[in-house]
Design a protein with these regions (language model features):
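Acidic/polar loop patches that form or flank catalytic/metal-binding clefts of enzymes
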Residues: 29, 237-238, 274-275, 288-290, ...
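Flexible glycine/proline-enriched surface loops and loop-helix/loop-strand junctions
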Residues: 70, 168, 207-208, 257-262, ...
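Long, contiguous, secondary-structure-rich segments that constitute the structural scaffold
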Residues: 462-520, 588-601, 605-695
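Glycine-rich phosphate/diphosphate-binding loops that line cofactor/substrate pockets in enzymes
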Residues: 84-104, 155-164, 254, 275-289, ...
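A glycine-rich phosphate-binding loop feature that marks nucleotide/adenosyl-phosphate handling sites
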Residues: 109-110, 243-245, 325-336, 492-504, ...
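Glycine/threonine-rich phosphate-binding loop and adjacent beta-strand/alpha-helix elements that clamp
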Residues: 156, 440-465, 475-476, 480, ...
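Extended redox/cofactor-interaction regions of prokaryotic respiratory oxidoreductases
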Residues: 116-197, 204, 220-224, 310-428, ...
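N-terminal export/assembly segments and adjacent metallocofactor-ligating motifs
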Residues: 1-233, 262, 270, 392, ...
Length: 695
């Protein structure tokens, strides 16, 4: 078969970059970023380039498997797909019959290809759908909701046109988002300036004009000091604030105690540098982006950190502005029709959510949900029994804290099923493993991308599956057919795409040219239109959220100085890297070769005081939890911080490369399922202090 190029979408991390794949004889030969998409320009990160080695790897689930021993024992029976889907349908039917559809939890990647899976959960009669953002981004989402009345996915980071950018605990040039990285590089090339705030130096900080090596856990003090200066010096956009911001006087009272000098004592950042940054932001306004954070389940005040980042943008008139945070346009905003949704084919579910969102926590939204809250409620059957969990490309035992406790919780389920393309700690405990085809071997739904130029994006199958694996729509469609959801029982991707596109005026062949169909020729930057109202109680950006006040939650907090770790102890901090995305890439042949294990970053002076040398293996412990890991010493990490990349320390026998390599950071988080941000609802994964000792 002659070579051909297929436009598709990467699936190696949650960013999902548009790609083009050269295929010959039904085999993927070369993969690169989609050269026809602005800001991609053929670029692809290392993870994306490892998609072909993943397809060729034999150490992944190859066929449906039924557990034939104790959970975690590793004894499996191979099933046909007919047997596997029948088994899953039987187990789900039993749980629904005995406890109701609400007793099923579904943990999902979320994102633009998830509509059919969400509809399936609705068809089960369950309100308990959770996306990956419930672990990583819920504090950021709720911060936006409290201010604007909508989630942060309705805002665009216009990095390309920004003149001042602040990246706070966002290592954009290593934990790569190709489009945003290229846009930021374009901005810097055109005279834009970058400030990086982090507890250690990174590739991103090496590109910065200013680098603030901040004391871990003190970002809130920095942000409040910037707001204090903006208000006290009257550097904010007064006309914008008068029109679009509510409770500005109250914000002034809340920030009165956060002078740059107070922030310096807490953060270690000189007051003069805080003043200079604020002046520079005001000068560049409204073409300013203060990044609200990527993985924001860090501290018990991370909601406040995200919220103050958004507030700084708003005070500078950047919300709704080109070069700032313009509102994401939907197809309807440019005179087009959006995709049809599968959820509209089924009645809504009125049951209360197991995580308390919407009733116990009325301010929070059910989009991502609070998976940790739902799982923690299982032992007490509160608010009702939870008896089944289905995961789609998610690994709670590797992503959530305290997997020791969580394993015991999952043991109380009647049914645990995992739809996954790679082995995971959770799949190893499952009753049923349904192998998902790697993204190069499956097609997906059409995705709707809201933004300054709304578009539809299509993932096509590039090659036939090597093993007995299936696409997500095939698995969900097969289950739907067996459970009486005929409206979701699709038998071909073309039928799915036809349903989605009906009435939009877009045809399937329109994707042939470049894999993406833009719905407008000109970017839609705004500004905020006359008469526009934010969907908040006041119709404005609320410095004090009425919605949060009704739940008894604080919109902002007072200064709470952090304790300093004692000698030999460090605050455990986490972050991404350019090679791995949590745990599912660790056994990838290409990526493992380049980064086989994680290391623990320590400040070289702090380590010297303990007699620890670079490259040595040290012991780490928290309460009764302990492990070993190699250290990397640097002068460019805060002395109170210990940093590592999460996801390592795999225990799975099928993964010959990753098994036993590195340290699982989440195992050093005893009680972590119950340590949460009270105003945001998210986890606080960096509220753990570890002891490091020389061996």
């Amino acid at each position: 078969m002659p070579a051909k190029t297929i436009y598709s979408v990467c699936g190696m991390c949650p960013v999902r970059c548009p790609i083009e794949v050269d295929v010959e004889n039904d085999e993927c030969r070369f993969i690169q970023g989609n050269r026809q998409v602005p800001s991609i320009r053929g670029a692809l990160c290392t993870r994306g380039g490892a998609g072909i080695p993943f397809v060729r790897d034999d150490e992944r689930p190859q066929f449906p498997m039924l557990r034939k021993g104790a959970r975690g024992e590793g004894r499996w029976q191979r099933l046909s797909w007919e047997e596997a889907l029948a088994q899953a349908a039987e187990k789900l039917t039993a749980v629904r019959s005995n406890y109701g559809g609400r007793s099923v939890l579904w943990s999902d990647t979320g994102g633009p290809f998830s509509d059919l899976r969400q509809a399936f959960v609705r068809g089960l009669g369950s309100p308990n759908y959770f996306s990956a953002e419930s672990v990583q981004g819920v504090n950021r989402q709720h911060a936006a909701l409290s201010l604007f009345g909508f989630s942060d996915d309705q805002l665009v980071l216009d990095l390309k046109n920004a003149r001042e950018v602040v990246l706070q605990a966002r290592n954009l040039f290593e934990s790569v988002h190709i489009q945003q990285a290229n846009d930021l590089l374009d901005s810097l090339a055109n005279g834009g300036r970058l400030t990086v705030v982090d507890t250690r130096a990174t590739v991103t900080s090496s590109k910065a004009d200013r680098f603030f090596l901040i004391r871990p856990g003190t970002d809130y003090a920095l942000n409040m000091a910037v707001i204090h200066v903006l208000l006290e010096r009257k550097l904010y956009d007064a006309a914008y604030a008068e029109k679009w911001i509510a409770d500005l006087d109250e914000l002034g009272r809340m920030t009165a105690g956060f002078s740059p000098e107070v922030a310096e004592a807490e953060t270690g950042i000189p007051a003069a540098d805080i003043e200079a940054l604020t002046q520079a932001l005001a000068k560049a306004a409204p073409k300013v982006v203060w990044h609200p954070g990527w993985k924001t389940s860090r501290y018990t005040d991370s909601f406040f950190v995200c919220r103050t980042a958004f507030i700084i943008n708003a005070l500078l008139g950047a919300v709704g502005a080109r070069g700032g945070l313009p509102l994401a346009a939907r197809p309807e905003d440019v005179g087009q029709k959006g995709l049809n949704r599968f959820g509209d084919l089924l009645p809504s579910v009125t049951e209360q959510r197991a995580d308390g969102v919407g009733w116990k926590y009325p301010a929070f939204e059910g989009g991502p949900g609070l998976l940790h809250s739902a799982l923690s409620a299982i032992p007490a059957n509160d608010p009702y029994p939870i008896k089944a969990l289905v995961t789609y490309q998610q690994d709670p035992l590797a992503e959530l804290p305290d997997p020791q406790k969580l394993t015991a919780i999952l043991a109380g389920l009647d049914f645990l099923a995992c739809i996954t393309s790679a082995w995971s700690e959770t799949a190893w405990q499952a009753d049923l493993v349904l192998p998902l085809s790697p993204y190069l071997e499956r097609e997906s739904l059409i995705a709707q991308l809201d933004g300054v130029k709304p578009a539809f994006l299509l993932r096509r199958r590039c090659a036939s599956p090597r093993f007995d694996t299936r696409a997500d729509w095939e698995i969900v469609g097969g289950l739907a057919r067996r459970l009486g959801m005929e409206s979701l029982a699709f038998t071909s991707p073309e039928d799915i795409w036809k349903f989605q596109l009906n009435g939009t005026g877009v045809r399937l062949q329109d994707f042939d040219a470049k894999g993406i169909v833009e719905l407008t020729g000109q970017p839609n930057y705004g500004p905020l239109a006359e008469g526009f109202r934010f969907p908040t109680d006041s119709g404005k950006i609320e410095m004090v959220s009425f919605r949060w006040r009704r739940q008894g939650l604080a919109s902002l907090g007072s200064l709470a100085p952090r304790d300093r770790p004692t000698a030999g102890t460090f605050r455990l901090t986490l972050g991404g890297c350019g090679l791995h995305d949590e745990g599912h890439t660790l056994n990838n042949p290409l990526l493992h070769k380049q980064m086989p294990e994680n290391v623990l970053w320590l400040n070289q002076d702090a380590a010297a005081a303990l007699g620890i040398k670079d490259g040595e293996t040290v012991g780490v412990s928290v309460q009764d939890r302990s492990g070993r890991i190699r250290v990397r010493l640097s002068e460019f990490i805060h002395p109170e911080a210990a940093f590592t990349v999460p996801g390592f320390g795999r225990t799975l026998p099928p993964e010959s490369r990753a098994q036993g390599r590195g340290l699982a950071a989440n195992r050093l988080m005893p009680g972590g399922l119950d340590i949460r941000d009270p105003s945001g609802g998210g986890l606080a994964l960096q509220e753990h202090v570890i002891t490091v000792r020389k061996l």
